[in-house]
UniProtKB/Swiss-Prot annotation:
Residues annotated as the enzyme's active site: D465
Keywords carried by this UniProt record: ATP-binding, Cell membrane, Glycoprotein, Kinase, Membrane, Nucleotide-binding, Phosphoprotein, Receptor, Repeat, Serine/threonine-protein kinase, Signal, Stress response, Transferase, Transmembrane, Transmembrane helix
Protein name: Cysteine-rich receptor-like protein kinase 36
Main location: membrane
Phosphothreonine PTM sites in chain numbering: T505
The keyword Transmembrane appears for this protein: yes
Record Pfam families: PK_Tyr_Ser-Thr, Stress-antifung
Species assigned in the record: Arabidopsis thaliana (Mouse-ear cress)
GO cellular component, one term: plasma membrane
PROSITE patterns hit by this protein: GNK2, PROTEIN_KINASE_ATP, PROTEIN_KINASE_DOM, PROTEIN_KINASE_ST
Length: 658
């Protein structure tokens, strides 16, 4: 854990400054490490930061991106106004480019009272997404309290209010991208009004956010205990408090009244309305009340034990980020799915069936019941549980829990109401619902989900089975990558692996994976490229039996006959954007894995207002090997059986009725 003492940071020259002119309250911190000479870092930084303002709006208030060693993010406070957020991020970006020019790392928390906005812009030459960053600290204390104030009482009331605000801010609101945010307004005994705002970057876990904010409160109490307001900022979290309502964050928020002063002790406390207090009356009132209370407590305890036994238990083995894995009781799942009734069945996959369920709370769930002998063994089951409980991204399906009682192996996911992508893109009656903007958003979302898996999560994961049927669509048609049963976890210093058991869906698998069992992040990039071309054409890859969609699209590209690639439903849409996406798709399906782009580059190219140059694609992969033919027998590091090649044509997919 990083230390929070400001004076133990030898590598940083802290330039935390406060401007409070015309209602602008801004704190920025620059590092003292300069760029290495003759590098493109400054050019990439100057190209990346100006793009944050528009992209943070498109991403609903939080945006992170990287470009050739520059890692940046932008964040606005919850309930922001679009133009105010855009201006705030743009101003913060320009401030960092001018005030921290030449520095490898900096961050800037900015707020503007008149515009009702606050925001963060942060950049670094080190990958920090999803990681708690406590240093360097920016501390901006305000004016001192009135010396006649009761500082001890103020400190106690402040600590109590701050602790409650920390709990609110660090409790994740999964309905919002800006999930870590809290404000409070209270009247203290000796202070008419105290307003607090706390926020964390959404890439943190709830426990990391809580720790970061508590460190801010502790630091504030140690250094600013005699002030009427101030700001303590860190790269991962922000705490500001003041004696007035700032940045529009407290509109329609009721102020908590001051605690009542303790009444003076009266010597005649046993006398009321001229009558002597009768001790025996206590027995008359308290005895039956005590019996009723004891019965009530016993009932509550019995109910809680029964509920815990029948419904759920929390797995004691929490994952590394402190989030416990929810282990569902089989009885609860049977109740939720009406004992796996046919009416609740949503679909059938290669590894089992998927059912819709409803928890006692009313929450809808999707229950994947793995079939015996399906091929998804105990290791694969644990693999998916361990991976998904440690992954949190809006473009990944959320695992709610699991059950492994007796012979049952069950995974419980969030219910995603709009089925999977293949139910729309390959259905003539539904494909028109996928407008160009919806398709673009789906493609971007899948790309961001893959980038998170490959680079931005605490793990490095290769999905290995990306395809249209493994992309689920929520109520607003936002994509969520699903099905991690075949995913492989890499160490951070690993880039590729080999296997003798090639699993996946033929047509989406990269040629080096099909032929040699070699897989890497570029294998997922290939699958993404196939899916992207399917989104443009509205055709399944397998419809091009003799050569495959990538090869077909490549031929039409070099012949200049792009009309035969494009879905007729897209004829009235921006041709330059469609061609750009075809180009990106062809780059992703190139025969040579080394020439395929990273998902980081794909995200950069997908920016609609970007000015980046996209390379020209080379020849796409021609994977025409039929399923009945096995590739050449080659030496592989994981060879355990004689058959070097086995294909699961249909892998487990969360399907929903059409």
């Amino acid at each position: 854990m990083e230390r929070s003492n400001l004076f133990h940071i030898p590598c940083f020259l802290l330039l935390f400054l406060l401007f409070n002119i015309n209602g602008v309250h801004t704190t920025f911190v620059c590092g003292d490490e300069d760029f290495s000479p003759n590098t493109s870092y400054v050019e990439n930084l100057e190209s990346l930061l100006p793009s944050l303002a528009s992209n943070v709006i498109r991403e609903r208030g939080f945006y992170n991106v990287s470009l050739d060693g520059v890692y940046a993010l932008a964040l606005c406070r919850k309930h922001y106004e679009v133009q105010a957020c855009r201006r705030c991020v743009d101003r913060a970006s320009r401030t960092l480019l001018t005030q921290c020019r030449g520095k490898t790392e900096a961050y800037h928390w900015d707020s503007e009272n008149d515009a009702n906005v606050s925001c963060l812009v942060r950049y670094s030459n080190i990958h920090r997404f999803g990681k708690l960053k406590l240093e360097p600290i920016g501390n901006v204390p305000h004016s001192s309290l009135d010396p006649s104030s009761n500082l001890t009482r103020i400190s106690q009331e402040f600590a109590a209010r701050a602790n409650r605000t920390v709990e609110v801010a660090s409790t994740a609101d999964e309905s919002s991208v800006l999930k870590y945010y809290g404000v409070s307004s209270a009247e203290f005994t000796d202070t008419p009004e105290v307003n607090m705002l706390m926020q964390c970057t959404p890439d943190l876990s709830s426990s990391d956010c809580n720790h970061c904010l508590r460190e801010n409160v502790r630091y504030n109490q140690e250094h600013n205990w005699d002030r009427v307001g101030g700001t303590v900022a860190r790269p991962s979290c922000y705490f500001r408090w003041d004696d007035y309502r700032f940045a529009g964050a407290f509109d329609n928020l009721e102020r908590v009244p001051a605690p009542p002063r303790s009444p003076q002790t009266r010597q005649d406390y046993r006398v009321k309305k001229g009558r002597m207090f009768q001790p025996w009356s206590v027995v008359v009132v308290v005895f039956p009340t005590g019996i009723n209370l004891a019965v009530f407590v016993a009932f509550v305890l019995a109910y809680r034990r029964m509920r815990r036994r029948i419904y759920t238990e929390i797995n004691k083995n929490s994952d590394s980020d402190g989030q416990a894995t929810l282990r569902f009781d089989l009885g609860m799942i049977l109740i939720a799915t009406n004992e796996f009734s046919l009416e609740n069945k949503l679909g059938q996959g290669g590894f089992g069936s998927v059912y819709k369920g409803i928890l006692p709370s009313g929450q809808e769930i999707a229950v994947k019941r793995l079939a015996g002998g399906s091929g998804q063994g105990e290791l694969e089951f644990k693999n998916e549980v361990l991976l998904l409980t440690r992954l949190q991204h809006r473009n990944l399906v959320k695992l709610l829990g699991f059950c492994n009682e007796g012979n049952e192996e069950i995974l419980v996911y969030e219910h995603v109401p709009n089925s999977s992508l293949d139910h729309f893109i390959f259905d003539e009656d539904k494909r028109w619902l996928l407008t160009w903007d919806v398709r673009y958003r789906i493609i971007e979302g899948v790309a961001r989900g893959l980038l998170y898996l490959h680079e931005d999560s605490q793990l490095r994961i290769i999905h290995r089975d990306l395809k249209a049927s493994n992309i689920l669509l929520d109520a607003e048609m936002n994509p969520k990558v699903a099905d991690f049963g075949m995913a492989r976890l890499f160490n951070m210093d690993e880039t590729r692996g080999e296997t003798s058991r090639v699993v996946g869906t033929y047509g989406y698998m990269a040629p080096e994976y099909v032929r040699h069992g070699q897989f890497s992040a570029k294998s997922d990039v290939y699958s993404f490229g196939v899916m992207l071309l399917e989104m443009i054409s509205g055709e399944k890859n397998k419809n091009f039996e003799t050569e495959g969609l990538p090869a077909f699209a490549w031929k039409r590209w070099i012949e200049g006959e792009l009309e035969s690639i494009i879905d007729p439903y897209l004829n009235e849409n921006p041709r330059n954007e469609i061609i750009k996406l075809i180009q990106i798709g062809l780059l992703c399906v190139q025969e040579n894995a080394a020439k395929r782009p990273t998902m980081n580059s794909v995200i950069t190219w997908l920016a609609r207002d970007g000015t980046f140059t996209i390379p020209k694609p080379t020849e796409a992969a021609f994977v025409t090997l039929p399923l009945s033919v096995k590739p050449e027998n080659r030496s592989m590091s994981e060879r355990k059986d004689k058959d070097p090649f086995s294909v699961d044509e249909v892998s487990i997919t969360v399907l929903y009725p059409r």
